[in-house]
Swiss-Prot record:
Residue ranges occupied by any SET domain in the UniProt entry: 5-239
Binding residue positions for Zn(2+) 2: C63, C66, H84, C88
Keywords: Chromatin regulator, Cytoplasm, Metal-binding, Methyltransferase, Nucleus, S-adenosyl-L-methionine, Transcription, Transcription regulation, Transferase, Zinc, Zinc-finger
Organism of derivation: Xenopus laevis (African clawed frog)
Cited SMART domains: SET
Stated name of the protein: N-lysine methyltransferase SMYD2-B
Substrates-to-products reaction catalysed: L-lysyl(4)-[histone H3] + 3 S-adenosyl-L-methionine = N(6),N(6),N(6)-trimethyl-L-lysyl(4)-[histone H3] + 3 S-adenosyl-L-homocysteine + 3 H(+); L-lysyl-[protein] + S-adenosyl-L-methionine = N(6)-methyl-L-lysyl-[protein] + S-adenosyl-L-homocysteine + H(+)
Compartmental location: Cytoplasm, Cytosol; Nucleus
Protein role: Protein-lysine N-methyltransferase that methylates both histones and non-histone proteins, including p53/TP53 and RB1. Specifically trimethylates histone H3 'Lys-4' (H3K4me3) in vivo. The activity requires interaction with HSP90alpha. Shows even higher methyltransferase activity on p53/TP53. Monomethylates 'Lys-370' of p53/TP53, leading to decreased DNA-binding activity and subsequent transcriptional regulation activity of p53/TP53. Monomethylates RB1 at 'Lys-860'.
The EC number(s) this enzyme carries: 2.1.1.-, 2.1.1.354
Superkingdom as given in the UniProt entry: Eukaryota
InterPro entries, per database record: H3K4_H4K5_MeTrfase, SET_dom, SET_dom_sf, SMYD2_SET, TPR-like_helical_dom_sf, Znf_MYND
Length: 430
């Protein structure tokens, strides 16, 4: 099992391990693909996607025993059985009380795979799961407590599979998963599941990435979003790049325990536009601006928590009130305004208020195109949502334009032969 051509693992100065190109890659070219080492479909997508291959289709067949896993056909059901059998009987016996988190489910599958798989897999051509960083020594008490809760859930729902694992090993594995796990998303960036892609995890982060990771079922694909020359390191982005430098680095330190020194973080050249203020005859004081940024960061976090327990109309009210308050100091293209508009759009989509969703989306798309890199999935998915909203409201001319804008980005990011591209082209023919 050879390594993909044109790439090699190396020691990246100041960053530890990394991946570099040994030949040049053109814009949109596939560098490599990586099948998932293990993966799990998210609970909310059960019945919409096959648990084994993640295909989205209607009329999937249920597992005869637990009635909670869904498959395209017998082949997919058989393919998934080594992993589904970890859960099937527990799902039956626990009923409504079966509630392990996605991280716990994924970790149980890693443990099961490690018991049966002794050779390196096709997902580990550059790096094995065992080599993952855990950053265990850097975890604060809150993060350690969350891991302890996950270990308890693992023992509760997967007792047969973890009876001979000691707590220290489980703590280490959960810390590895937290740093190296991936979320699989669809073309509109809706969450489909979680997975482990060891070779993809080898790539280091930059806020000016030269590759992008997309998914074809349960396979990750890595494509160039800039021209890459021989000898250059291959960088992906670990985080959402909308936010200003300080916020991005707070997120990187909290989740991955490092700060970024890429060109964007060194120059901060996009920050002034991302944090732009209203031109007022009586400009706000520096302290007022700082206070509003603090308020904005707090409301972002408050909303994230509120999603779990508030009603859609209450969530929309949080968005509207915060936009009203921030709008006294920030312009509409300020990233904190955009963040809350995006949340409001999501709530409108959930409530099937298509006109409301469109109102927010139309405000978001132009600044998104300015703040994000050229071939951004965030921009593509926004054009796609807008296009589908316009088409649904029979505004076909403007809908066609929006869908074509999404396609132009996706043909580079996903590759021209991706089934998402074929689906959108079908939508354009209607």
């Amino acid at each position: 099992m050879g390594q993909p051509e044109g790439l090699e693992r190396f020691d990246s100065p100041g960053k530890g391990r990394g991946l570099k190109a040994t030949r040049s890659f053109a814009l949109g070219e596939l560098l490599f693909s990586c099948p998932a080492y293990t993966y799990v479909l998210t609970d909310n997508e059960r019945g919409n996607h096959c648990d084994f291959c993640f295909t989205r289709k209607e009329g999937l067949s249920k597992c005869g025993k637990c009635k909670q896993a869904f498959y395209c056909n017998v082949d997919c059901q058989k393919g998934d059985w080594p992993m589904h059998k970890l859960e099937c009987s527990s799902m039956c016996s626990s009923g409504q009380n079966w509630c392990p988190s996605e991280t716990v489910r994924l970790t149980a599958r890693i443990l099961a795979k490690q018991k049966t798989q002794t050779e390196r897999t096709a997902s580990e051509r550059f790096m094995s799961v065992k080599e993952f960083e855990s950053h265990l020594s850097k975890l604060d008490n809150e993060k350690k407590e969350l891991i302890e809760n996950d270990i308890s859930a693992l023992h509760r729902f997967y007792s047969k599979n973890v009876h001979n694992c000691d707590n220290a090993a489980l703590e280490f594995l959960f810390a590895q998963v937290n740093c190296n796990g991936f979320t699989i998303e669809d073309e509109e960036l809706s969450h489909l599941g979680s997975a482990i892609f060891p070779d993809v995890a080898l790539m280091n982060h930059s806020c000016c990435p030269n590759v992008i990771v997309t998914y074809k079922g349960t396979v990750a694909e890595v494509r160039a979003v800039q021209e890459i020359h021989a000898g250059e390191e291959v960088f992906t982005s670990y985080i959402d790049l909308l936010y200003p430098t300080e916020d991005r680095n707070d997120r990187l330190k909290d989740s991955y325990f490092f700060s970024c020194d890429c060109r964007e973080c060194s120059t901060k050249q996009k920050d002034p536009a991302k944090l732009e203020l209203r031109k007022l005859s009586d400009p706000p004081s520096p302290q007022t601006v700082r206070d509003m940024i603090t308020y904005a960061r707090n409301v972002v976090e408050e909303f994230r928590r509120a999603k779990h327990y508030k009603t859609p109309s209450e969530l929309l009210e949080i968005c509207e009130l915060s936009l009203d308050k921030m709008g006294s100091v920030f312009v509409d293209s300020n990233v904190y305004m955009l963040h809350m508009m995006y949340q409001a759009m999501g709530v409108c989509l959930y409530m099937q208020d298509w006109e409301g969703a469109l109102k927010y989306g139309e405000k978001i798309i132009k600044p998104y195109s300015k703040h994000y890199p050229a071939y951004s999935l965030n921009v593509a998915s926004m054009w796609l949502k807008l296009g589908r909203l316009y088409m649904g409201l029979e505004k076909n001319t403007i809908g066609t334009k929006a869908l074509k804008k999404a396609l132009a980005i996706m043909e580079i990011a996903h590759g021209p032969d991706h089934y998402y591209i074929a689906e959108i082209k079908k939508e354009l023919e209607l």
